[in-house]
Amino acid sequence: MQVHVIRRENRALYAGLLEKYFRIRHQIYVVERGWKELDRPDGREIDQFDTEDAVYLLGVDNDDIVAGMRMVPTTSPTLLSDVFPQLALAGPVRRPDAYELSRIFVVPRKRGEHGGPRAEAVIQAAAMEYGLSIGLSAFTIVLETWWLPRLVDQGWKAKPLGLPQDINGFSTTAVIVDVDDDAWVGICNRRSVPGPTLEWRGLEAIRRHSLPEFQVIS
């Protein structure tokens, strides 16, 4: 599985893939999870945070999207700032070096697979790889509270921004996660991700920071 970076600079190269991506989001969030407020007549799940500022990481295997994630600069409107501000006691994070992660998914047929690294781990490691590459120092995430131990177990330093609250019947919290070398190397080693996975097609002009030396621990 390779993870493609899609930004405003190369979005035209991925028009067809993005169309599939938004339809997969509809299937997962509207049909499977029942978020009917996101339903649209065109069968795509697109919200107010799918702007030109959004960055998409799409995991592709044999030309099929199997995992995805959206990243939004916290200097722009985010889920935390505009929908769930009550989850951050000190107010939503707004920093040029921090992005919000959202719409993180793996398609049903790839969930829980055991042949090699799981798609879930690859897409999350790709987020850390992207953050390091462009010089970020933090991610914010609005998530169901049961996710917290899993983040810690994969080597991420996740700090709650407030107290968990019941949202639509689910205990939900907001966290800030450090983006650093240890977080990327940690998830790769703990989840058997074999190093860098990002494809920067059409983004050759983007200045990227070097990644730390990586060695798989067997």
UniProtKB/Swiss-Prot annotation:
Keyword Cytoplasm part of the UniProt annotation: no
Stated role: Catalyzes the synthesis of 4-coumaroyl-homoserine lactone, a quorum-sensing (QS) autoinducer molecule which binds to RpaR transcriptional regulator to regulate expression of QS-dependent genes.
One Pfam family this sequence matches: Autoind_synth
Keywords: Autoinducer synthesis, Quorum sensing, S-adenosyl-L-methionine, Transferase
Name the record gives this protein: 4-coumaroyl-homoserine lactone synthase
Gene3D superfamilies: 3.40.630.30
Gene name for this UniProt entry: rpaI
Enzyme class: transferase
